[in-house]
Amino acid sequence: MASDPDNRSHVTNNQSNATRRGVSRRQYIAGAGAAGVAAFAGCSGGDGGDGSDGGSMGGDGTTTINIITWEEYAEMQENIESTLDGVELNITPSTSSTEMFSQWSSGQDEQYDIAVPNNNLVPRFMDADLVAPVNNDVVNNFGSMYDRFQSFVDNQFTESGNAYGVPIRFGWYGYSYDSRSVPDHEPSYDILFEDDYVDADLDGEIIMYDEAAKSIPAAALYLGMDDAMSGARMTFTEDQLSEIQELLIQQKPRLQGYIAPDPTFIQEFRQANFLVGHSGRNETVQMRSEGDDWVEFVAPREGALAWYETAVVSAASDNKETAWEVINEFITPQNGAALAEAGFSPSTNPNVADKLTEEQNELYGRIDPSRLEGMYSLKDIASDVEEAYVSTWEEVKAA
């Protein structure tokens, strides 16, 4: 049972067309309704319809690239098809990186050309020999990405000098707080674990993610175990896991509870059911875009936990070069801006800022690179301590 943080925020922007500035209707599929239509149209033929392999060649010379990915990627379909001559995208929407891996490992890698799982799943695809190395001659936008994501690739899924995935968009976890009740303070995980860190009574006013993959790393960073977070996988010792378990159990009397992300988090926060919440940035961006100017999100000084969606190409694809051409388009400024707007998540290409308004840039545009340096990428637990890791979380929840 390796960690799989699929329950991060994948929020679709349902703003009206009047407020969708900076990306034209002519260039992109406008609105969540059109995105859903395009996505589910792709779903109807995601496996080639007749069981054929992915990346089929049509009778008119059109190459169809079959993709399993998150719903918002349909926002780029129209523009990519108009940019790449003779290429048609067939998009199957998914809500789970684990689902993507399970499908490919059960034989559907022959039915898809591209998947876009969370970064922590890419090593599993690699270990199962399901993915092809990046074609650097084709993915010429790779060098335009933030340096931090290029280093994440080197650290997490590069073997024998070959990278096996391209980061597309990202987000990170820290905590949110209600600025009407919680005073300004230096961002720190201390607020989650120490009674007197701020001048506010937070007993029963804190929530944590109901997921080991997010709550255990938060406790680890508070305890200064950043070395265990720095490799390709989390490498806690059993003694460290025992210390983490003790901390999380001691914290429980301060908690309002454990909570799922996205709509549940937002609903509970708006109902004032907690004041401080371990959370992703996306939830706060959505709330602020909808008028909740009292909510603040911060990245703790000890380090934030970053996720990033990573495009991979099936080793079984008959159209690898075309698939990499499509992935290269995912991180162009125009397409990256459309995807950022659709899901409130920044592109790994900072040049998207040129395609967004000032207001959009504040929410999901260019990020100061220095802010990325203190982030640790989300990753699986090392196999030799996986059993102890799972047991740690089970003991915390049962206490």
Give residue ranges: language-model regions:
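Loop-centered beta-sheet repeat module
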Residues: A212-L221, M225-S230
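Terminal disorder- and signal-encoded targeting elements
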Residues: M1-T158, N162-P167, W172, S179-D203, ...
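Short, solvent-exposed positions on alpha-helices
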Residues: E321-W324, A337
